[in-house]
């Protein structure tokens, strides 16, 4: 144990459950390597300054913006879609609250907008009409989703579950694990 698994069949187990999670998506934008990954911020590995641009208006990005606002900071959300938190299955009360909160507290939300460059203290964004805007930012947080990171593929006795199989939320991964375990 405490070593990378390179061949799950070599473990000699009757059944193997792979629950290795997911890795953060990256964006092909100049300067993106200087941004903080959402998970690193959430785990307290990196702190942020006053003005923070959050790239990604999904549930995680919106919750980060909400928390930053409560800390007295100035979050700004940049989202490529035409609305925040478009993932199906997210609690409507939560999504409605966050949208209303951002509107009531004048948190800048840029919808249908992409990032063209992350610079020193700035983020350049481009809206659907091609207009460029430069935002001042002490920090940038990337919250652009995750992709499965399995160490093995499904097989008769290999069960890939949770985010290693399909990125979801806490409910979906727990229910999926329960379903798999009940079949063993």
Where are these regions (language model features)?
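Glycine-/small-residue-rich beta->alpha transition segments that form the dinucleotide
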Residues: 13-15, 19-25, 39-41, 137-150
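A conserved short coil-to-beta-strand element within the FAD-binding core of flavoproteins
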Residues: 1-11, 22-25, 111-122
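Rossmann-like dinucleotide-binding cores of NAD(P)H-dependent redox enzymes
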Residues: 67-113
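Catalytic cores of nucleotide-enabled group-transfer and carboxylate-activating enzymes in metabolic
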Residues: 9-11, 15-16, 51-54, 65, ...
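A conserved FAD-binding loop/helix module that cradles the flavin
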Residues: 62-64, 86-95, 159-184
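Hydrophobic/aromatic beta-strand patches that form the interior of the parallel beta-sheet core
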Residues: 15-17, 36, 53, 76-78, ...
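Glycine-rich dinucleotide-binding loop and its adjacent helix/turn
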Residues: 1, 6, 20-71, 156-169
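Glycine-rich nucleotide phosphate-binding loop and flanking beta-alpha elements
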Residues: 23-25, 61, 84, 131, ...
